[in-house]
Amino acid sequence: PFLVKEEKILILALESEDQKQITDAIKSTLKSCIQTRGVKVEDLPTFDIEYIFLNIRGKSVGESLDVMVTCPDDGKTQVEHKIYIDEIKVEKDKKHNRDIKLDNTLTLRMKYPSLTQFVENNFNTSADDNLESSMNVIASCIDVVFNEDESWAAVDCTKKELNDWLETLNTNQFKEIETFFDTMPKLTHIIKVTNPNTKVESEVVMEGLTSFFG
């Protein structure tokens, strides 16, 4: 369970509103709490990290969260809402598929971003532009490219080789890769809120760990 040390690190990270600091705090907390041998926190998919962390926190410091939610109808009124942690699930889109058909013979198999990749690609201190950063994320999630006769593993390629190969794809092929990320499993919860000023009831979709600590 959480100790005072872990809770203090987490609170300071959340108060900073710095995503990298929050991510590092989550990683540190999970390493302290997970007893299973062979589990490498850095290699777990981001959505597994978020789900495990949320449930460890729930068992340790309370099984509900009070969050501030902005009412969609006016975009400014905030209301407090209680969420029970056991109701928050990792949702997978039915259209999601790790295998992407690039043409009649070639298939690209993707893997999910790990926490390590998430931090490296989102909080790099160099002055990468958004396009380059996005390409790096995609390249880091390539697992293997294969056809009926051969396969080419991403681990055998350099980062530059992967990025150069991505640039040879056409628009439709690239859109299929974007769909992989858009539909990949997410920590998701749908709540209903009523604006006290307008009396309008709306549904709000909350996604990702930081949504539940707002």
Model-derived regions: residue spans:
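Short, surface-exposed, charged amphipathic helix/loop patches that serve as local interaction elements
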Residues: P1-G214
